[in-house]
Amino acid sequence: MPRVTVTLGLALLWSGSIHAQSLQAGAWSSNGSAAGYVMEANGRATDPDGATVSLQSQNAAAGTFGSAGSSLVADAIKGRRVSVSAELQTRGVGTGASLWLRIDRNATMLMMDNGVDRPVRGDSEWTRYSVSLPVPDDATMIVFGVLLRGTGRVVARNIRVEAGSPLTPGGPLADPAREVLEAAIAIVKQNALRRDEVPWTTVEPRVRAYAAGAQTSADVYPAIRYLLSELGDHHSFLSPPSQTTALRTGSVRNLDPEVRSMSDGVGYVMVPGYQGWEPSALRVYAGQFHQLLDTVRASVECGWIIDLRQDVGGNMWPMLAGLKPFLGDAALGTFESLSKSSPPWRAGAGVGVQPSSSLAVLESAWVAVLTGPRTASSGEAVTIAFRGRPRTRSFGLPTAGLSTSNGTFALPDGAALLLTTAVEADRTGRRYGDKIEPDQLVENDPAKGDPAIEAATQWLRASSTCRAGAK
């Protein structure tokens, strides 16, 4: 079982950042991972002509997203399937645009489909798009909208919400659907970190009821997502076959790390998230990371800033391999499951790229680590890797709170469960599993530039005294 600390699970949470309780029924609200998106909305999805919504990025990075959302009370649609449909027009969309749909019970998400596994990209003319989910009898709200990831513009017109036929209680499942559902339930029961906290006598019958009548494996995905939501770890998720294939083949688009020397003699390293498991791509990433460090190293006299504030997660191993010059061969942490501790994990494990000897000096360099609310999952694993390192201090804001580890479990149809199976512990044995507080809290204040970088720079210059050892 590959162990990958991932945050593709954030794809399930993105649109969940719009809270149904904050919306007036039928009204539209915008949200996202960062500033830089503009929303325009007209009409309601229940109007005869539907609604029209546009989202446009303005100076948005490839790893960010903008979301528009609306909601309806679920009372009139309980016990039926609900569909949200629209026509999408895109311009210059690099990462993807889609519709999303979420079913809530009070303040808890029951199930969701955000369409990230079937994005509309590039320039397209009025592509028909729809998402559909069953509405359980205990649902209270239906939340839905438009999602734009990365750069570009999307217009969704004729957005409509429609109730379908009643769900068939106890309807038989076709073999492909049954095989996937049974495999998912068994995997969760045997491996989930919080499996003992699930009221199985209540939850399992609901899962099977939500999957009733399913004919294809995709038809049971909403039921599986509901099951994962009942774990309450906020990190487990289902990766459909197309998304799983993209991760395994290295076809996911990733941002490059940024390495540069600042004017005050401090080195700056920005580590973004990294999605993918393909071995040769991991080696290329780590090797290029080392080359960037080697190019800048000689001009750095006062220590280094490792900026993890945009590290939304993915695969922790190439990130640690790229940062191995700072981390060396030390034991950095462990994965703590219900029954055992993993062997200590180390930088470079599973990637197979060693930094050049010219970078050995960085192992004793002064390092300031920056964190924030978008530092998530594998970004938090990297944060933990620096805990207990000499000459190191962290600055900024608390992390996202996903400092747990996911194992990858294949399903019969090519999909995969990325299931939370352990919490993470640092080299001193301290266990996490929630938000990680920085050593020095620094609030964001755009009017004052970047206070976290300023605080980190002041500490580096005072601590390292800009000696040769700071390199």
Name each region found by the language model.
Residues A184, L227, V269, I306, ...:
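Terminal peptide-recognition signature
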Residues G313-L370, T404-A410, T421-R427, R431-Y432:
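Gly/Ser/Thr-rich loop/hinge elements
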Residues D264-V266, S299-W304, D329-L332, E363-V367, ...:
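Loop/turn elements at helix/coil->beta-strand transitions in domains of secreted/extracellular proteins
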Residues Q21-P172:
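Extracellular and organelle-lumenal recognition/adhesion modules and their flexible linkers in secreted
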Residues S261-A286:
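STAS-typified acidic loop motif
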Residues R195-D264, T465-A470:
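Extended, small/polar residue-biased N-terminal targeting/export presequences
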Residues T5-S17:
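Bacterial N-terminal signal peptides
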Residues V269, L292-G313, V369-L370:
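Short acidic catalytic loops
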